[in-house]
Amino acid sequence: MSEMQDYSSSLEDVNSRKFETFSYLPAMDADRIRKQVEYIVSKGWNPAIEHTEPENAFDHYWYMWKLPMFGETDIDTILKEAEACHKAHPNNHVRLIGFDNYAQSKGAEMVVYRGKPV
C-alpha cells in the first residue's frame, strides 16, 4: 500500500488553503470544469454561481451571482455566467453549485476561479 500523503493547509499560507474535495486535486482546466457542468446538468440539478472575497471564504456567506439558473440545460450559458461573475469580481473566489431539488440540498459545489489571496 502506498504511503499516506499529507496535504498541509494553514491559515498563514493562503496558497495552501483548501475549499472542497477538488481543491486537493490539481487545478481544473476548462475541459474538466465543463465536464462538471455537464454532470450537474445530467443530474437535473439547478446550477448557481456564488462569489466572495478570499478573506471571507471561510467565515461568511458567499454572495449569490444573480439568481440560480432554474432549469438551465445549456452548458455554455452556465459557463458564460461563471466567467461573467469572474470578470465582474476578478479578485474574488467564484464557485459553481448544483442544487438538487429532490434532496433539497447542494448536489455539487466547486470553486471554479480562485481569487487573489490577501
From Swiss-Prot:
Induction: Expressed when grown photoautotrophically (at protein level).
Gene3D superfamilies the UniProt entry points to: Ribulose bisphosphate carboxylase, small subunit (3.30.190.10)
UniProt keyword tRNA processing, yes or no: no
Keyword Nucleotide-binding among record annotations: no
InterPro entries, alphabetized: RuBisCO_ssu, RuBisCO_ssu_dom, RuBisCO_ssu_sf
Keywords for the protein's UniProt record, in alphabetical order: Calvin cycle, Carbon dioxide fixation, Photosynthesis
MF-aspect GO terms: ribulose-bisphosphate carboxylase activity
SUPFAM superfamilies: RuBisCO, small subunit (SSF55239)
Lineage: superkingdom: Bacteria
One GO BP: reductive pentose-phosphate cycle
PANTHER family recorded: RIBULOSE BISPHOSPHATE CARBOXYLASE SMALL CHAIN 1, CHLOROPLASTIC (PTHR31262)
Free-text function comment from the UniProt entry: RuBisCO catalyzes two reactions: the carboxylation of D-ribulose 1,5-bisphosphate, the primary event in carbon dioxide fixation, as well as the oxidative fragmentation of the pentose substrate. Both reactions occur simultaneously and in competition at the same active site. Although the small subunit is not catalytic it is essential for maximal activity.
UniProt subunit comment: Heterohexadecamer of 8 large and 8 small subunits.
Similarity comment text for this entry: Belongs to the RuBisCO small chain family.
HAMAP family according to UniProt: RuBisCO_S_bact
Remarks, miscellaneous: The basic functional RuBisCO is composed of a large chain homodimer in a 'head-to-tail' conformation. In form I RuBisCO this homodimer is arranged in a barrel-like tetramer with the small subunits forming a tetrameric 'cap' on each end of the 'barrel'.
Protein name stated in the entry: Ribulose bisphosphate carboxylase small subunit 1
Encoding gene (name): cbbS1
